[in-house]
Regions:
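GH16 jelly-roll
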Residues: 1-145
Length: 145
């Protein structure tokens, strides 16, 4: 952990089926900021970012985490919902809604996984050089279909 550290496990669509970002969606399985004791689990799409529909349904949640420990982050992806988990416990569900703009559910196409450790940015603020180097330790990754 460090000021300006932004480790993340997230997903983007393999192709631009619906047009440029954010029309194909983004799934943030885990984002952690600085020294916070929580993670962010969020969905982004044209529906949430451009149409500002962040509460119908809620597009994300925060969950307490022990950031110095190993944690198991999971996403179970179903045709009608995304189910986020932390250490085997369900933390957030993003459902597919009927009767709303079609951009609410771009999650009907293949996505790829990104695991990265970003430094700095508008959300996390500047990097404190005294906190370098930073790391995100990963013990294992499991994908199944």
């Amino acid at each position: 952990m460090a000021q300006g550290a932004w480790p993340a496990i997230w997903m983007l669509a393999e192709e631009e089926r619906y047009g440029p970002y954010p029309k194909n969606g983004e799934i943030d399985i885990m984002e952690h900021l600085n020294f916070e004791d929580k993670i962010y689990q969020t969905t982004h799409s044209y529906y949430t970012l451009n149409l500002k529909q962040t509460e119908n349904p809620p597009h994300g949640a925060t969950t307490p985490v022990k950031a110095d420990d190993y944690n198991i982050y999971a996403l179970s992806w179903y045709p009608d919902r995304l189910v986020f988990q932390l250490n085997g416990k369900e933390t957030f569900v993003y459902p597919r809604l009927n009767g709303v703009d079609a951009s609410q559910w771009p999650y009907d196409q293949p996505f790829y996984l990104i695991i990265d450790q970003q430094l700095g940015g508008n959300w996390v603020g500047p990097v404190d050089l005294d906190h370098l180097p930073v790391e995100m330790a990963i013990d294992w990754v499991k994908l199944y279909q």
